[in-house]
A protein has these predicted regions:
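C-terminal transmembrane helical hairpin of 12-TM major facilitator-type secondary transporters
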Residues: 285-330
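Cytoplasmic helix-loop-helix junction between adjacent transmembrane helices
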Residues: 111-149
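Helix-loop-helix hairpin linking two adjacent transmembrane segments in secondary transporters
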Residues: 146-193
């Protein structure tokens, strides 16, 4: 293992350099992965799918994407983050291009699986690299700023995809956004090497290792923290997956408007992620996570009660806060609890649990909707979230992190 020394920088000193590049990289990585949910009504009608089959469309990507996080984390700890991040960007672009070229349901499912497998290197590799560039007291802010890129993709991609789909259909949306993603991945690899202005920085980008104790400590807090964070995120994402179908079938909204409406949720990430990082630096990672997780269940239940309009838009915005505020807190908590030589591997487990959990739960929620309707499904989902949060809070309440 290489041991390299890199000077920790202030948060603001990073803004003209590496950090904005990582924000753009995060944006590019999710530009295509953000498409299946808003385009689901169009895909459903094209292949005449029911709710369960629609859930399987989303699971094809999320399950493979989740599993690939494990391999991506393991490889990052051994060959370094630069290659894995680049593969994560170009891989989803290639997979998305093939999805856009698919002509049958089976072909689309196969290429969605491929897209997930090729994209698993980005998330386990990027947070440790970003976190090593700042002092620990600013770690949450840096990670929150980095998350703006992903949030921007999930906010803009539905709007762009809906506009493209009006002319070229859902396949045109995948193809149009996949091509620039691949191009950026290649450019990113070159720029990341050029922006390393010292030999130490270059080694840091290539190897990703530094001097830290080689242990995983405070396991009794780390495990329930990861369980709570990933379970809440997985349930929330699985529920979000059916919101476009919910507004089409429940409120009679057009498919194109439903595709664009999902952007309201992800708009929250543009400011909720930095806010979550800032709050976690000031108040602690655990208090931020517990507060937001206690909100998740009631907010999902309120989808049953709020009529379409400004109130419904407010609920979507709060769901976005529930989704995005805990993310920088969770990443910062894991980075702070785990030695650097194992960080990407543990982050791989974290993202596997969250994304893979979404892949498992999405068809389950689709099945419940098919058999019991939206009202009972949202009610049950909210109750389960509250219960899990209560149980995990028992183990986390006294944590000072």
């Amino acid at each position: 293992m290489k041991v390299n020394i890199i000077k920790k920088r202030s948060f603001h000193s990073l803004l003209p350099g590496l950090l904005p590049l990582f924000v753009l990289a995060h944006f590019a990585h999710h530009l295509v992965t953000a498409l299946p949910v808003p385009l689901l009504p169009l895909i459903r009608d094209d292949f005449a799918l029911d709710y369960t089959q629609s859930g399987l469309v989303l699971s094809a990507f999320t399950l493979s994407y989740g599993v690939s996080q494990l391999l991506g984390g393991w490889l990052t700890d051994r060959i370094g983050p630069r290659i894995l991040i680049t593969m994560g960007i170009c891989g989803v672009g290639l997979g998305g291009l093939l999805v856009g070229l698919s002509q049958t349901y089976v072909m689309m499912i196969a290429f969605l699986v491929l897209m997930g497998l090729l994209g698993g290197g980005y998330h386990p590799a990027s947070p440790p690299l970003v976190s090593t560039l700042v002092e620990s007291k600013n770690r949450g802010r840096a990670l929150g700023f980095h998350l703006i890129g992903g949030s921007a993709s999930f906010f803009l991609a539905p709007l762009i995809a809906a506009a493209i789909a009006l002319v070229w259909g859902w396949r045109g949306s995948f193809i149009t956004l996949a091509v620039p993603t691949i191009v950026f991945g290649i450019v990113f690899y070159i720029l990341l090497g050029r922006l390393a202005d010292t030999k130490q920085d270059q080694d840091k980008i290539i190897s990703g290792h530094n001097q830290t104790p080689p242990t995983v400590h405070r396991l009794h807090h780390l495990v329930p923290f990861i369980i709570l964070s990933t379970f809440t995120g997985a349930v929330t994402l699985a529920t979000i997956s059916f919101i476009p179908l919910f507004v089409v079938d429940h409120f009679g909204i057009s498919r194109e408007v439903a595709a664009a409406l999902i952007a309201v949720i992800y708009f929250a990430g543009l400011w909720a992620s930095p806010l979550g990082g800032h709050l976690s630096d000031r108040l602690g990672r655990v208090p931020v996570l517990l507060t937001v997780c206690f909100m998740a269940g009631p907010v999902i239940y309120l989808l049953n009660l709020v009529p379409y309009g400004l109130g419904f838009g407010a609920i979507l915005l709060i769901i976005g806060m529930v989704l995005y505020i805990p993310q920088p807190a969770s990443e910062a908590y894991i980075v702070g609890q785990v030695s650097e030589r194992h960080r990407s591997s543990i982050l791989g487990i974290y993202y596997f649990s969250a994304i893979g959990g979404t892949g498992v739960l999405t068809p389950v929620i689709g099945y419940l909707i098919d058999h019991f309707g939206f009202y009972l499904t949202f009610t049950l989902t909210g109750a389960v979230l509250v219960t899990v949060t209560l149980v995990c809070s028992i183990f986390l309440w006294r944590s000072r992190d």
